[in-house]
Swiss-Prot record:
Stretches for region Interaction with PRMT1: 609-894
Protein name: Interleukin enhancer-binding factor 3
Motif Bipartite nuclear localization signal location, chain numbering: 371-389
Crosslink position(s): Glycyl lysine isopeptide (Lys-Gly) (interchain with G-Cter in ubiquitin): K297
Cross-link (Glycyl lysine isopeptide (Lys-Gly) (interchain with G-Cter in SUMO2)): K396, K489
Annotated ranges, domain DRBM: 398-467, 524-590
Gene Ontology MF terms in the entry: DNA binding; double-stranded RNA binding; mRNA 3'-UTR AU-rich region binding; RNA binding; single-stranded RNA binding; virus receptor activity
Name of the gene: ILF3
Region (Disordered): 50-86, 363-401, 466-524, 625-660, 718-894
Annotated localization: Nucleus, Nucleolus; Cytoplasm; Nucleus
Sequence ranges of Acidic residues compositional bias: 60-73
Keywords tagged on the record: Acetylation, Antiviral defense, Cytoplasm, DNA-binding, Isopeptide bond, Methylation, Nucleus, Phosphoprotein, Repeat, RNA-binding, Transcription, Transcription regulation, Ubl conjugation
Pfam families (UniProt xref): dsrm, DZF_C, DZF_N
Length: 894
């Protein structure tokens, strides 16, 4: 369903058309005069007939003649009292266009129904018509012409002045319908009809019109826009012959059904479109549902009189009209000229036209209202309702929101072209830079979204022009509010600084207008509520206040930390909580580093490899096929990755594993891209691939594949983490480094993508065990460990079978140059360089879940050359960490 604002143009056209077809005040007054004169005259006729029948002694009862009220629930007989049952003329009721308020310009035919006690006869019709002329002359000076139409069971009154109105009085009686029902039920009638009884079908039609009028008043009059749409469609039925058969009762039922089934009130344009949609759907087609007549006891189709061709024509016409409306050409459907795009300001009309009620109800007879009038100032009204009313009035009295900087600039300089200069930052928190050129000067600003960046650019431009940016007034008012809150609550030690610096594009947090555009993060890149919860458990956030209307809410949340209270405000409770937590963090923990703040597990931080004991040597740029690896640029510290691995110590599978992106995922610029195995892994232990002059094995058998604080074989099983016991330490001294090796030009399987870099020799790239554990776990002088894995490529949802055999093999081979056979992330290191061949401390990634076999480097011990194996990565359908995996499959989710 379209937003409501799109229907505004349709509303204007429909209302303009409605105004053009709505009767003038003079026409309505003429109708009202004629109807009221006739009603009073008929009342006098009823009194006269009653006097003749009962004599002058019962004249006093004449005042009790009752016109059934228009909202009567039966056919005029339900409200009659016992003493009125003997009257020949029971009452008169308005029906048709007059009762429903559907009169248009040029509608000259009016209708009334005169209810009789018995079946109306020709004699009664003559008597009423004759006396009616006398009574009309007594009631008014206007001249009326009275005609008798026995065939139609009616009396026709015509006026002699403009407009030439014609009022038809239908004579009928409820007895006609009652007898018909008895006949249909098979009962025999004991009473014979008089010979001059009027046409039964005409009488039944008059009774039906009575039911239609009452149903319409009860159901359609209360629906917003329903009466307006019916009037507009009545005009359409007059102009377009195709729609003619729908005119009258079927059209009224259709409109009420379409508009009444909507889940909310609609404007005139939207309501008209809904009626057209209903017709276009084929409701009137021969195989359609039809339109049920609610005023008949038996199931009756109100459009049963239409033939097949008429039904198809109406449906096709409605579809065409709906198509025109969808393309903004509703004026063609309405038969009018298109309105200008800008609405002219209408002068305030002191007496707005009430389009629902055209003719006020009859005042000839005093009718007791059905409902008690609502007591406006009753004392029994609950105080909560009073409070709500006062609150609503206050909300309405609030001034409209001021323009923001972008709106203000567009008013001053319409048609400015904003250009996207760049987009930086990660996918989950991008930073957009927008620029705009104003009077030859170029302005740039950044923000978490294009919209925010444009707003910041506009602020810069307005500041440069020396104009207000639209944020000052709001900031000052917010400041006053916060000051009042501080005075009212002296216990608040540090109220949250609600940052709303629209005028400073580089502000830490955007303004209210843009706060929801990007996430609210601390300087460590975490959610403030989460970070505060890590430091202080069990904090409770309380809602202090909630202001503003439904479209512009303002929440203030408060949290108490260490006896101090902090507040935050925002457009929803989540944002307010975040700002409150942010205020607490800035006040109580201003300079605490993130890695040391975490109180989840108090463990000593693992020293970084390449520190004082293992000084990192600089390396030249490599020559891997993925492009140069930037070896001396450390990754940004303290960035937490999602999933496996983290800052300093890892969690779960692959502990201590993180690439240059510290995310625990295979970086696109990684050397091998498996768990801590290869050039770019932050925990690259053994077989770290140095492209130029590096050691094939990690120097001096660096312990355990550089597991981040966790030793063990770290075999990666499908279901859980497995750490086998640490072998006994070798008592001897650690082996010296291998000799200088020649540059290796082998393919290091570095798939380089975009701007990603691999940090092979940075302070963060070798997280090994603590220094005391960094001696190689070798049982002999030339010991090495051999890890072999047999992997079944795991199909989608299939079982994985991992078989791993590890051999601790003691050889006597001295330094052999660090030959490395990689099997699914494990390493085979003969010679003194071999630790135990897990490759990475927390998980020798066999790629068991993903099903892959990747063969890594083979380094010849004699020449020191680095021969890279062929890219034999057999990936399953699930992707994985193999070097040949698609870059889009680099992220493995658990």
């Amino acid at each position: 369903m379209r937003p409501m604002r799109i229907f505004v143009n349709d509303d204007r056209h429909v209302m303009a058309k409605h105004s053009s077809v709505y009767p003038t005040q003079e026409e309505l007054e003429a109708v009202q005069n004629m109807v009221s004169h006739t009603e009073r005259a008929l009342k006098a006729v009823s009194d006269w007939i009653d006097e003749q029948e009962k004599g002058s002694s019962e004249q006093a009862e004449s005042d009790n003649m009752d016109v059934p009220p228009e909202d009567d629930s039966k056919e005029g007989a339900g409200e009659q009292k016992t003493e009125h049952m003997t009257r020949t003329l029971r009452g008169v009721m308005r029906v048709g266009l007059v009762a429903k308020g559907l009169l248009l310009k040029g509608d000259l035919d009016l209708e009334l129904v005169l209810l009789c006690k018995e079946k109306p006869t020709t004699a009664l019709l003559d008597k009423v018509a004759d006396n009616l002329a006398i009574q009309l002359a007594a009631v008014t000076e206007d001249k009326y012409e009275i005609l008798q139409s026995v065939d139609d069971a009616a009396i026709v009154i015509k006026n002699t002045k403009e407009p030439p109105l014609s009022l038809t009085i239908h004579l009928t009686s409820p007895v006609v319908r009652e007898e018909m029902e008895k006949v249909l039920a098979g009962e025999t009638l004991s009473v014979n009809d008089p010979p001059d009884v009027l046409d039964r079908q005409k009488c039944l039609a008059a009774l039906a019109s009575l039911r239609h009028a009452k149903w319409f008043q009860a159901r359609a009059n209360g629906l917003k826009s329903c009466v307006i749409v019916i009037r507009v469609l009545r005009d359409l039925c007059t102009r377009v012959p195709t729609w003619g058969p729908l005119r009258g009762w079927p059209l009224e039922l259709l409109c009420e059904k379409s508009i009444g089934t909507a889940n909310r009130p609609m404007g005139a344009g939207e309501a008209l479109r809904r009626v057209l949609e209903c017709l276009a759907s084929g409701i009137v087609m021969p195989d359609g549902s039809g339109i049920y007549d609610p005023c008949e006891k038996e199931a009756t189709d109100a459009i049963g009189h239409l033939d097949r061709q008429q039904r198809e024509d109406i449906t096709q016409s409605a579809q065409h009209a709906l198509r025109l409306a969808a393309f903004g050409q509703l004026h063609k459907v309405l038969g009018m000229d298109p309105l200008p795009s800008k609405m002219p300001k209408k002068p305030k009309n002191e007496n707005p036209v009430d389009y629902t009620v055209q003719i006020p109800p009859s005042t000839t007879y005093a009718i007791t209202p059905m409902k008690r009038p609502m007591e406006e100032d009753g004392e029994e009204k609950s105080p909560s309702k009073k409070k709500k009313k006062i609150q609503k009035k206050e909300e309405k009295a609030e001034p409209p929101q001021a323009m923001n900087a972008l709106m203000r600039l567009n008013q001053l300089k319409p048609g400015l072209q904003y250009k996207l200069v760049s987009q930086t930052g990660p996918v989950h928190a991008p930073i957009f830079t927008m620029s705009v050129e104003v009077d030859g000067n170029s302005f740039e600003a950044s923000g978490p979204s294009k919209k925010t960046a444009k707003l910041h650019v506009a602020v810069k431009v307005l500041q440069d022009m020396g104009l207000p940016t639209g944020a000052e007034g709001r900031d000052s008012s917010k400041g006053e509010d916060s000051a009042e809150e501080t005075e009212a609550k002296p216990a608040v030690v540090a109220p949250a600084p609600v940052v709303e610096a629209v005028s400073t594009p580089s502000a830490a947090f955007p303004s209210d207008a843009t706060a929801e555009q990007g996430p609210i993060l601390t300087k460590h890149g975490k959610n403030p509520v989460m970070e505060l919860n890590e430091k202080r458990r069990g904090l409770k956030y309380e809602l202090i206040s909630e202001t503003g209307g439904s479209h512009d809410k303002r929440f203030v949340m408060e949290v108490e930390v260490d006896g101090q209270k902090f507040q935050g405000a925002g457009s929803n409770k989540k944002v307010a909580k975040a700002y409150a937590a942010l205020a607490a963090l800035e006040k109580l923990f201003p300079d605490t580093p993130l890695a040391l703040d975490a109180n989840k597990k108090k463990r000593a931080p693992v020293p970084v490899r390449g520190g004082p004991k293992f000084a990192a040597k600089p390396h030249n740029p490599g020559f891997g096929m993925g492009g140069p690896m930037h070896n001396e640029v450390p990754p940004p510290p303290n960035l937490r990755g999602r999933g496996r691995g983290g800052s300093i110590r890892g969690r779960g599978r692959g502990r201590g594993f993180g690439g240059a992106n510290h995310g625990g995922y295979m970086n696109a610029g990684a050397g091998y891209g498996s768990y801590g195995y290869g050039g770019n892994s932050a925990t690259a232990g053994y077989s770290q691939f140095y492209s130029n002059g590096g050691h094939s094995g990690n120097a001096s058998g660096g312990g355990g594949g550089g597991g981040g604080g966790s030793s063990g074989y770290g075999s990666y099983y499908q279901g859980d983490n497995y750490n086998s016991p640490v072998p006994p330490k070798h008592a001897g001294k650690k082996q010296p480094h291998g000799g200088q090796q020649k540059p290796s030009y082998g393919s290091g399987y570095q798939s380089h993508q975009g701007q990603q870099q691999s940090y092979n020799q940075s302070p963060y790239s070798n997280y090994g065990p603590p220094q005391g554990k960094q001696k190689g776990y070798n049982h002999g002088q030339g010991s090495y460990s051999y890890s072999n894995s047999y992997n079944s490529p795991g199909g989608g949802g299939g079982s994985d079978y991992n078989y791993e055999s590890k051999f601790n093999y003691s050889g006597s081979g001295g330094r052999s140059g660090g030959n490395s056979y990689g099997s699914g992330g494990a390493s085979y290191n003969p010679g003194s360089h071999g630790g135990y061949g897990g490759g990475s401390g927390g998980g020798s990634s066999y790629q068991g879940k993903q099903g892959g076999y990747s063969q890594s480097n083979y380094n010849s011990p004699g020449s020191g050359q680095n021969y890279s194996g062929p890219p034999s990565s057999y990936q399953s359908s699930q992707g994985g960490y193999g070097r040949n995996a698609d870059h889009s499959m680099n992220y493995q989710y658990r």
